[in-house]
UniProtKB/Swiss-Prot annotation:
Major localisation: cytoplasm
Disulfide bond positions: none
Top-level taxon in the UniProt lineage: Eukaryota
Function in brief: Required for the assembly and/or stability of the 40S ribosomal subunit. Required for the processing of the 20S rRNA-precursor to mature 18S rRNA in a late step of the maturation of 40S ribosomal subunits.
Chain spans, region Disordered: 268-290
Gene Ontology cellular-component annotations: cytosolic small ribosomal subunit
Quaternary structure and interacting proteins, as annotated: Component of the small ribosomal subunit. Mature ribosomes consist of a small (40S) and a large (60S) subunit. The 40S subunit contains about 33 different proteins and 1 molecule of RNA (18S). The 60S subunit contains about 49 different proteins and 3 molecules of RNA (25S, 5.8S and 5S). Interacts with RPS21.
Entry protein name: Small ribosomal subunit protein uS2
Naturally occurring in which organism (per UniProt): Malassezia globosa (strain ATCC MYA-4612 / CBS 7966) (Dandruff-associated fungus)
Alphabetized UniProt keyword annotations: Cytoplasm, Ribonucleoprotein, Ribosomal protein
Localization in the cell: Cytoplasm
Similarity comment text for this entry: Belongs to the universal ribosomal protein uS2 family.
């Protein structure tokens, strides 16, 4: 791969494998004229394939521009696309940049009266089509724009275009992860070794909130079930029904004395020996009502 950048900045086979696995090279059926230099070829089904070598060159170039900014807080990373929300937050957490995820408030770069007013040195957007408001305002106030651009992305007011698939969640997360890693390497924060940065690329991938809630609910139920089982095992006592000693299988002597001799059966239907309704001859009790 012919490149004008230093050999130390060349991609490793692992980096190329990640880009291909995340389908970063898969474009769209539409292709802007300005994006033609970044297209490798067009497939039979009409899908344009992006040159991975160009993607890496522009990625390193963008990282060198960001590393030149003295204060990382002056870098504003923006993503109105849902798949890029987590990626920009992770990028900001690892670099100290300012993240804007979700709807971009109009006037954030031009109207100083708004609460969200910012004056960044450079901005990085996920998709020029979706983040067009931020790009337009940056053009008004002369803020350089770095953008992840698919084959159908308009490059108007975009200063540095990083060609790549900006519609898949894996591709978006990987591009932001590579940009963050290269930024930290150029800053000297992490070494340029295969295991120099211990943050996995999965941390930059978008996750469905419902999936996260489902996993948390399942974990809570499993924890409650484990606690209930532990409590039940600790409270159950083993009862010994075996009776040992002289009294085992014996009969109470006082009860046996009242039983009829000779094994006669007791007639429980016989009349009682005493008439409970008979007059006992006792004088009636005196009453105070008389």
């Amino acid at each position: 791969m012919a490149s004008k950048q230093p050999a130390i900045l060349n991609p490793t086979p692992e980096d190329i494998s990640l880009l291909l696995a995340a389908q970063t090279h898969i474009g769209t059926k539409n292709c802007e004229k300005a994006m033609l230099p970044y297209v490798h070829k067009r497939r039979a089904d009409g899908i344009h394939l992006i040159n991975i070598g160009k993607t890496w060159e522009k990625l390193v170039f963008a990282a060198r521009v960001l590393a030149a900014v003295e204060n990382p807080a002056d870098i504003c990373v923006i993503s109105s696309r849902t798949y890029g929300h987590r990626a920009v937050h992770k990028f900001a957490a690892n670099t100290g940049a300012t993240a804007i995820a979700g709807r971009f408030t109009p006037g954030s770069f031009t109207n100083y009266i708004t609460r969200s007013f910012k004056e960044p040195r450079v901005i990085v957007v996920t998709d020029p089509r979706v983040d067009h408001q931020a790009i337009r305002e940056s053009a008004y106030v002369n803020i350089p724009v770095i953008a992840l651009c698919d084959t159908d992305a308009p490059l108007r007011h975009v200063d540095i275009a990083i060609p790549g698939n900006n519609k898949g969640r894996h591709s978006i997360g990987l591009l932001w992860w590579l940009l963050c890693r290269e930024f930290l390497r150029l800053r000297g924060i992490v070494p340029r070794t295969p295991n120099g940065w211990n943050v996995m690329v999965d941390m930059f991938f978008y996750r469905d909130p419902e999936e996260i809630e489902r996993e948390q609910a399942e974990a809570a139920l499993a924890k409650q079930a484990a606690a209930a089982n532990a409590m039940q095992e600790s409270t159950i006592e083993q009862v010994d029904f075996a009776i040992e000693g002289a009294g085992a299988g014996g009969v109470n002597p006082s009860v046996a004395a009242n039983l009829p001799a000779g094994g006669e059966q007791v007639d429980w239907s016989a009349d009682a020996a005493q008439d409970w309704a008979a007059d006992t001859g006792a004088a009636p009790a005196a009453s105070s009502w008389d």
